[in-house]
Design a protein with these regions (language model features):
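Conserved N-terminal beta-strand and adjoining loop/helix that marks the start
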Residues: 2-6
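Hydrophobic residues in beta-strands and at strand termini
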Residues: 7, 28, 71-73
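Active-site-proximal or metal-binding-adjacent scaffold patches in catalytic folds
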Residues: 8, 12-15
Length: 85
């Protein structure tokens, strides 16, 4: 399943939930430098969907806050629940 996420770096409260436009919000404590925020976002999304970190891949948006991720085996109901937070 492809998921659009919006990464918010340097957040005091890291986590996954809520939405900004059509994108799932992923808050990370890491700065948006050297791919640190992206790596943290991939790990948080993997944990939120209960899949291994290695199975979540970045499709587009390596240098953007809005990213498209491929999350194989992601449950659409889980996505709806996370967007509603």
């Amino acid at each position: 399943m492809r998921i659009t996420v919006r990464v918010q770096p340097r957040s005091a409260h890291p986590g996954v939930g809520g939405h900004h436009d059509e994108a799932l919000v992923v808050r990370v404590s890491e700065p948006a430098a050297d791919g640190k925020a992206t790596a943290a976002a991939l790990a948080l999304v993997a944990a939120a969907f209960g899949v291994g970190r290695g199975s979540v891949t970045l499709v587009a948006g390596a240098r953007s806050r809005v990213k498209i991720l491929d999350v194989p085996g992601a449950d659409p109901a889980t996505l709806e629940r996370l967007l509603a937070l």
